């Protein structure tokens, strides 16, 4: 997709026009569009993609293929659910500060929202296994989650060329909405091999408005073109992980795990087709309070269509010394080039991504030194964006750091407060540059009393 929406002086104006709380046109009751952000590129596709990684993985470069943990969820690779050792309720929040600029100007903006809600649990309670002295050679996990997947928010104004008869014109473009995903995830593990699936229900609504007005004629009627469309439908995700555990000779001559292992992982989505329903409306109104005129020119509702979501895959390799050290790298690709949407046709590009991450725990079993039990994380992410400006694809490069702070709940089950900070650059150099700092805060509240089989003697 190629577009020339961002000439330098206009780009500066559009950045200042919306901020985080853009207001509606005060003289028109037709629309109530209040974007939560002002991102020009969110006009295309289904909006700005929102990271689906939880706070723990966000601090490690957004690793997803190989990350598995006994007390954290990794729903991007559902196979990791089979490694859970406790029921985990997770909630995540994020805030982002962006400095946007072109060759001649800059602006600052804040945004933030809920990142995810999720509940996951093992299918075999580890306490029962221990009390019954059963081998944990197989297990499973299940989870339910809700998260936004895209966000649309823009409020900008483009000045048209001066017309000899009508004078200069203005086009005010505004949009809001986004897409969400509710997922049911499940996984099974036998020895070192885990496999899982995500069943995703995608839904959402997006509203786009364009108001054309004549700047030099205050009495001239303005024309608004309003488009709304919703999406709904299912697609599938998948994941596999294999952990090769290193062993050593035990006291009785048998082989026992050393706690060190290599993890190979693959995950992704199968794409899929979802339903769309669009409504189109064009109308005229008076932009001033002197003359009140409202006239609907055309309206059409219930326009059924389809949208093809892209498929993706990620391959990863990691080394772990359990409860001590983790390092991983991965490569992924998403086929946005096959994306289609009858309600809002756009041309997107395939994207690739690379991520590197590390986690270090000084002493997970330390009794009286809190900071030795903290999980310290760092990472790097390099990835494309499916949208392009003037034929050049946008890109994001970022470094991440994070910590996982262990906390004890009344049941003495360990839980975590996870914080990740990402510093990066996004956009196309000298056309649309964004330097940002993003904070992700996550709570992982764990309890192993679910499915606990109590016995009476």
Predicted features, each with a name:
Residues 1-27:
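Bacterial Sec-dependent N-terminal signal peptides
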Residues 23-457:
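Subset of outer-membrane beta-barrel
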């Amino acid at each position: 997709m190629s577009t020339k929406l961002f000439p330098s002086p206009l780009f500066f104006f559009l950045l200042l026009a919306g901020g985080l709380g853009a207001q509606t046109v005060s003289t028109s009751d037709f629309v109530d569009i209040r974007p939560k952000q002002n991102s020009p590129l969110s006009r295309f596709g289904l909006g700005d993609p929102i990271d689906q990684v939880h706070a723990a993985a966000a601090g490690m470069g957004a690793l997803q293929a190989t990350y598995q943990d006994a007390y954290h969820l990794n729903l991007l690779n559902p196979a990791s659910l089979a490694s859970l050792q406790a029921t985990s309720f997770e909630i995540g929040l994020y805030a982002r500060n962006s400095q946007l600029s072109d060759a001649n100007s800059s602006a600052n903006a804040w945004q933030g929202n809920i990142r995810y809600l999720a509940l996951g649990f093992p299918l075999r309670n580890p306490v029962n296994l221990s009390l019954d002295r059963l081998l944990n050679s197989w297990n499973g996990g299940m989870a339910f989650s809700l998260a936004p997947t895209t966000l649309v928010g823009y409020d900008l104004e483009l000045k048209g060329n001066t017309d000899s008869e009508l004078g200069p014109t203005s086009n005010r473009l505004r949009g809001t909405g986004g897409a969400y995903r509710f997922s049911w995830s499940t996984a099974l593990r036998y020895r070192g091999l885990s496999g899982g699936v995500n069943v995703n229900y995608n839904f959402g609504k997006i509203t786009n408005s364009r108001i054309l007005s004549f700047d030099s004629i205050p009495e001239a009627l303005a024309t608004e073109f309003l488009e709304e469309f919703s999406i709904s439908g299912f697609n599938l995700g998948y994941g596999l992980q294999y952990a090769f555990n290193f062993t050593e000779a035990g006291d009785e001559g048998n082989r026992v795990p050393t706690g060190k292992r290599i993890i190979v992982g693959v995950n992704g989505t199968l794409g899929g087709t979802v339903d769309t329903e669009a409504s189109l409306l064009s109308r005229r109104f008076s932009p001033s309070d002197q003359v009140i005129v409202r006239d609907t020119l055309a309206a059409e509702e219930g326009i059924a269509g389809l949208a093809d979501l892209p498929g993706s895959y990620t391959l990863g390799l990691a080394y772990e010394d359990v409860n001590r050290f983790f390092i991983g790298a991965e490569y992924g690709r998403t086929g946005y080039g096959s994306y289609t949407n009858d309600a809002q046709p756009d041309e997107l590009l395939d994207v690739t991504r690379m991520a590197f991450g590390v986690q270090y725990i000084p002493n997970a079993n330390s009794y009286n030194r809190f900071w030795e039990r903290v999980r310290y994380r760092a990472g790097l992410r390099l990835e494309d964006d499916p949208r392009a400006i003037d034929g050049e694809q946008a890109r994001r490069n970022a470094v991440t750091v994070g910590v996982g702070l262990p906390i004890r709940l009344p049941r003495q089950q360990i839980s975590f407060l996870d914080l990740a900070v990402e510093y990066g650059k996004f956009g196309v150099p000298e056309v649309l540059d964004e330097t940002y700092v993003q904070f992700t805060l996550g709570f992982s509240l764990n309890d192993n009393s679910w499915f606990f089989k109590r016995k009476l003697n």
